[in-house]
Curated annotation (Swiss-Prot):
Protein name: Cytoskeleton protein RodZ
Keywords in alphabetical order: Cell inner membrane, Cell membrane, Cell shape, DNA-binding, Membrane, Signal-anchor, Transmembrane, Transmembrane helix
Cellular compartments annotated: Cell inner membrane
Biased composition (Polar residues): 145-167, 208-218
HAMAP family given in the database record: RodZ
A GO MF label: DNA binding
Matches recorded under PANTHER family: CYTOSKELETON PROTEIN RODZ, PTHR34475
């Protein structure tokens, strides 16, 4: 009778009450139980009061109760029916893992962005290179074209220049061929005797028809007879070629160019006359005179040094850009594009 009454009494008690009674019989406090089970005092109190914390999973709660029962020497089989009521097993809700898929989509989007960025960068670099190459090629073609034109013009001018002296020297005029002794005599008297004879002025029209303008100037300078007649006998007579030479006067509009490398250039003056067009070699120099302003086209500005009116001309802007120099030098030496 006593055993059945005790069994009925144990069944009437809840799990928490049985654990509390067993703890009190062993003389343990809630603090001591919490320290031995490595739990909070509040968790031990909730177990003894048959409370199931909302933030605690049923699996952990059942484990705590079993550990508590072993500590106070209560068989676990006696607590199983009460555990089913106090801490029923609940199906845990497993949240779908979205972080991996989101990271994968983000990584894919970043990959497309990087690919597009590199594509744009390659396109920009390609366009820049193509633009530079076309500009460089156009400059080279322009230089080649100007050089070809200048060489063709120089060849045509040289052919014309060679044909003119041949025609004038080989043409036979009856007037000139009929009187060779007279022309020889007059030149002999002009160059060897201090006094000029009387027939010399009569020969001038024939000489003007044959000789060049420089020789005509020499003859006119040698015609004054009284001056030559008053020359002393001991003085040496000057040749007619030296008598016609005058001291050159420096032209204020002279254009001086010194070349440090091979360079093609073209120079024209205000009248449109082409003073020079062609290739100049290294260590060469060029002195040009004409009517200002001058128009210059220089294929390699870095290879030439220009002085105009005794002052150097600045070509640094063309050298920096490595372009064909096109400039105009006016009377005030202000180069303009």
């Amino acid at each position: 009778m006593n055993t059945e009454a005790t069994h009925d009494q144990n069944e009437a008690l809840t799990t928490g009450a049985r654990l509390r009674n067993a703890r009190e019989q062993l003389g343990l406090s809630q603090q001591a139980v919490a320290e031995r089970l490595c739990l909070k005092v509040s968790t031990v109190r909730d177990i003894e009061e048959d409370k199931a914390p909302a933030d605690l999973a049923s699996t952990f709660l059942r484990g705590y109760i079993r550990s508590y029962a072993r500590l106070v020497h209560i068989p676990e089989e006696e607590l199983l029916p009460g555990l089913e009521k106090q801490a029923p097993l609940r199906a845990a809700k497993v949240a779908p893992m979205q972080s991996f898929s989101l990271g994968k989509r983000r990584k894919k989007r970043d990959g497309w962005l990087m690919t597009f960025t590199w594509l744009v960068l390659f396109v920009v670099i390609g366009l820049s290179g193509a633009w530079w190459w076309q500009d460089h090629k156009a400059q080279q073609e322009e230089i080649t074209t100007m050089a070809d034109q200048s060489s063709a013009e120089l060849s045509s001018n040289s052919e014309q220049g060679q044909s003119v002296p041949l025609n004038t020297s080989t043409t036979t005029d009856p007037a000139t061929t009929s009187t060779p002794p007279a022309s020889v005599d007059t030149t002999a008297t002009n160059t060897q005797t201090p006094a000029v004879t009387a027939p010399a002025p009569a020969v001038d029209p024939q000489q003007n028809a044959v000789v060049s303008p420089s020789q005509a100037n020499v003859d006119t300078a040698a015609t004054p007879a009284p001056t030559a007649a008053t020359t002393p006998d001991g003085a040496a007579p000057l040749p007619t070629d030296q008598a016609g030479v005058t001291t050159p006067v420096a032209d204020p509009n002279a254009l001086v160019m010194n070349f440090t490398a091979d360079c093609w250039l073209e120079v024209t003056d205000a009248t449109g006359k082409r003073l020079f067009s062609g290739m100049q070699r290294k260590d060469g120099n060029l002195n040009l005179t004409g009517q200002a302003p001058y128009k210059l086209k220089i294929g390699a500005p870095a290879a030439v040094q220009i002085q105009y009116q005794g002052k150097p001309v600045d070509l640094s802007r063309f050298i920096r850009t490595n372009q064909v120099a096109r400039l105009t030098l006016n009377a005030e030496q202000s180069p303009a594009q």
